[in-house]
Each structure stands twice: as C-alpha cells, then as structure tokens.
C-alpha cells in the first residue's frame, strides 16, 4: 500500500535512499520541506550527506551551489544547474571546518582585483569569488591604521560617521578613509594655560618628581567674606566693581610685598603675572587684553581652512574654534581668527564692540550664552538702569505695566465716605498727581487707605473704556 509506505518514508525509515521511494513521487516535495536525507533513520538506512550528494548533480565547470554549501541540501535536486561537490568540508561553509582566515582565495590574474579583499583582507564569497586576490609574500597586503585604530585609505571617500563622531562601528573592515585629527582636541579649549614662572616642587611620587608645576602665590585677602563658605580665588581673577549677586566683592588690594600685576584674562580665566604696575580698575568696564602671541599659536595649531566656496562653519562663527581643525570641510573666515586684543568688557564680562551689531539675545534677556566669544556688541545702555547705581532696596518699583495710561488721583475729599475721583487722559502733561503730596514719595503713599494698587488699576481701566471721567462725587 502506498500510504504506509509514504508514512514510513516521512518518519525517516526506509531503504537508505533518504527516506523516500521514487515510486511514491514524494521525493521532490520532501526535499523542499527539508525532510529528505535525514541523517540515518530508524530503519538503519542512514543516508546522510553522502546519499544527498549522490543524488545532486556535480558540474565541475559551474559555480558551486551556495545553498548546498551552507545547508547540505538543495531544493531543486537534480534539476539544479550549479555544482554540488561531495566534499563540503573543503569549502567556506563546510560546517565551520575552515574559517575565512584559512581560506586560499583564488588568484585570477586576468580579472579585476577584489576591492573588498584589498581593504579588509577577507572575502565573503570565498573560493567562489570571480575577482583576483593577489598576495604579497604569502600574506595579505597590510592596511595602515590611525591612532584610533581605524584604517587609513588614501584616495577613498572620508567616512562621514567617523568625521562626525570620531568613531566607526565597522572598525578595520570599513572601506572609507579615516584621517588623523592632527592632535586637535575634541572639546574646544576656552581657558588658556596659566603662564607663571615654573617652580620645581617636591612630589610624593618618584615618577612625577621632575615635573615643572606652575604655582601662583596666594594673594592675602583674596577670600570672600560673608555667610557663604569661604572660597579662595586666584590672584589672576578679574576684580570687577559694581553689582554682584554675592554679599561682598573680592578685595582687589594686595598687601605687603606680595603685590602682583593683575591683567585681565579670558572669561573666568587666570591672569598673567608680570613686573609692571598694578592695573587700576575704575568704572563698570574692564579692558580685555588677551595674549596675542598665544592666540596666534592656537590658530596655527588648529589650522582652520579657508574654503570660500563652502558654507561658513557655524560652530566656528559662534565660538571662534573648530574641533575638526584642518579636516573641517566648511569655510573659516580669517577675520574671525584674528586675535581681538584691547577691547572692553562690561560688568557682566560681555564684550563691548562699538562698531558691531548689537546682540539681540542680550538685549532681550540681559545676558549672552556665548560670553566673550560672541561677535556682537553688548552695550550697557540697553538696560533701563545701571545695576551698580542703586542698591536693590532703593530701586523704584513700577506697579503698572509699561505703556499703561496711569489714572491720576483727584484731590481727596476730607470725608472718608466719599471715594476719590480718577481722571484718565491720554495727555502725558496732565497725567500727574493733583494731590498736594510730594512727587518724590513712593507710589503707595499717594493712595488713600484701603485702596490697593490692583484695585486702582482696575477702576482706572474701567473709566478709560467708558469714554470719559466720572462725575464729581460719583462712584461705581
């Protein structure tokens, strides 16, 4: 009967023909389902790979069947037009018997060179690759690596991911070029190193005993008194006069013979100690004298390229620095790289550039997030008042919004029952207090008892919208 025979063939039993008889007509479907050639069934046939290879055609002049090399089976059977070698162990996919490194890649002198093999040293097609795989003294051509361990391939396109992040997930197998950054630090250096006489100091570690460490002397009186934790400041800190959120300002007076020359350095930077007289800071503006030679050296180290046809480097336009250095593909104007020496900074340590355009962000918010690197002007005239003119307790506080027509008070009646009159007008000349109260008194003192500024504004706005002043003695 055919049904028991087919069931026995599907179960793996049978006569060593891979579990399927040619009489049943199920050989092709069973091979497509992966049931053929089951490694030796219960009937002792044990066909395995040998029987499967015996039924599959061998075509020496054709390419090897990749599916057969990987799985040991072929769904097309004897109708497959590729080669099915009996010894699968001698190929790349032969059950892991030989890895890719031990493969002998074919040398085809008349064919083009395998680019993937020349860049990575391996070939994923193995012996089936139709390109030429040259060898140099029996070894693969070496690939140069940069300091980060990524391949340097001159003449190839730069790896965009590496140029943005400094890393490459493909490692040495990446086919693109990974240039050196030329020692440019990944983070821009805003703070220049402290320039002070190098003094050799003893160090507890023997390997660090020969280090030359710059140690600026501590200036007496450079502590901040007050309720905060005492904090020692270096003698190079800029002593700014004027308004400060701290309870007391830094004492700029140097006592004794330890008087040092204090020059203004970059923002929060350390000053340079010299032998000239001490600079006297007067007024809210502080001269910003940066080191010209040091800035020029930094520009020479970075070597920012000028590419007139390319867009401007936005990071360089904002900060004056570029972490990519000479490898940056954008334009870096020379005028921004010129050292800006001798310009002034205001009491907020923001640059004053009289000929430049005012900083719109500073005019709206009162500060600038770019600091001294901002290329725009930060005048103190944009503020409504000088922060250092009056203490906070004596500053006048306006209870009305800007542009609001303040309703003036009529002469108050001696009777406490009568409500005060309010006269609203658009003429600024008449908008003045008609009460005999002095004009220098605060706003709260000219209001009658029981009347608050919020109530005053509400009633004044109501009278303004009604189209005229209230009648004498009238209320609400």
UniProtKB/Swiss-Prot annotation:
Disulfide bonds: none annotated. Residues 1-10 have a biased composition (Low complexity). The keyword Cell inner membrane does not apply. GO terms for molecular function: DNA binding; mRNA binding; zinc ion binding. A zinc finger (C3H1-type) spans 59-87, 108-136, 153-181, 307-335, 353-381. It comes from Oryza sativa subsp. japonica. Residues 1-57, 290-309, 456-476 are annotated as: Disordered. PROSITE patterns: ZF_C3H1. This is Zinc finger CCCH domain-containing protein 6. Residues 290-301 have a biased composition (Polar residues). Its main location: nucleus.
